[in-house]
Amino acid sequence: MDTELINKYVVLMEKIYSNSTTKYCSELSKLLNDKIDKFSLTASEELNKDFFHLVSKRKIESINNIEKESIIPIYAISKKETYYYEQIFQSLNKFLMDLITWEVLFFNDFFDMGIQQSAIYLNNIYKNSVNTIYDYTQKNLIGKNNDYFAISLMIIINFEQKKLMEKLNLNHLDFYFYEINKLLWPKFDQIYKATSEQIFKVNMKNNKLFTNGIHSVTHKLGEFLSMINLISKQTTNTPMIFAKLKEIQNLFNQFFYELTETMKFNNNNEREEMVTIFFINNIYYLLVKLKDFDAMKEENDPQSFDKILNNKRETYLNILIKKHFDEINKILQRCINKNNQANGVSFLENEVKKLTKNELKTVAQHFNNKYRDILNAVKKDIYSSIKDTENAKITYTKFLSELLNRYASFVDLLRMTKNDDLLMTIVSVQKLMIEINNITKTLNN
């Protein structure tokens, strides 16, 4: 091994790479688009559709372009192109990855060295280049960056690019990726806290903040949470992300309960129904944004979005049953033994004995004559109130199932009171179940 030749090569290449890296950082600075305040989550309390379109585009481009070749400044300048923080970051990392990948392969082959033997020489070659990019990133791409989406995407990019190097069995940049990660997460925490608090600072009496039943806070929070969801999917820091989602859940629930207190209604029944519908629409929207984050479905957490949605749906179903099938509902409420439902529905004998044949006949015949029309009316009611079609379908399907269960209990009550002649004239549970199954099938077409 010609040690003198190797040392001369190391000195020469270190200087070339160091100068090239410094120049590249300088040229990329001219291409940085940092004027995006008007597209931030907190720029306005009203909905900005351009903002949501831009965020979606940036997310897709970042995830799809992890391996994209580095930006060529002279070409970009000629085209008057500019780039977001995460794009500059991806380009710098890729520049460094390509530099080291090529140099490791060439150096080890040309000087006939193994990876361990060449490590000290290679470290001297690219040490200054790595430090230059690290310093530039720390100062310009993280220190001056208050873009929540950019920092989030940079966390993902850094994680994915480290995985690319691991696939090549090259660990030369492990420490660099680790140190960058140590810069990114504290910055994420800082922006996350400021942004999450600011999102909820709106005029609760401003009716312009509603779009098709969804509040602007929900729209913004959806984008905010979808990015957290994306970080959870793409990286391994799920416990920390989950803790932050818990914080958001509490803020969301507190905000919307306070918001509903500012709304005006004609009576308590209207208030209960409209507030319940409001929660179903807004929480479902957020859960769609978090569809890949299974930790949000912890049933034991009373503040979880999934738990609240289930509770609100149950409340809404009870409201609809009470509104459209109140006669059956009242009889069941009187007669069902609420203290003994572990093994199914049981009845209070004393209450059952108070039921008259005429009372049961009137209720049964009314259901028999009107249930199809009522089911259609309920469907229209749900689909006009629940804005998302899939959400409305789920809610209506649950309503049909709940109605079938209650009607089955009512029929059991008729059998218990020996009203066999009445049972012969009304729709059977089996027939109602078949009709409901057919309705459900049409919803999926």
Residue ranges and their predicted role:
Residues 4-8, 12, 16-23, 91-95, ...:
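Acidic, Ser/Thr-rich intrinsically disordered and amphipathic helical segments
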Residues 27-28, 189-198, 262-265, 313-332:
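Charged/polar, low-hydrophobicity segments characteristic of intrinsically disordered regions
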Residues 24, 41-298, 382-421, 425, ...:
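Extended alpha-helical solenoid scaffold regions that build the rod-like backbones
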Residues 7-9, 27-29, 111-113, 203, ...:
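Short coil/turn segments at secondary-structure boundaries
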Residues 1-10, 14-17, 21, 25-28, ...:
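Extended, charged coiled-coil scaffold/tether segments in eukaryotic proteins
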Residues 17-25, 32, 36, 104, ...:
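Eukaryotic basic, amphipathic alpha-helical target segments in cytosolic regions
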Residues 1, 32, 81, 300-303:
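Short linear interaction motifs
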Residues 287, 291-445:
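Long C-terminal extensions of eukaryotic subunits of large macromolecular complexes
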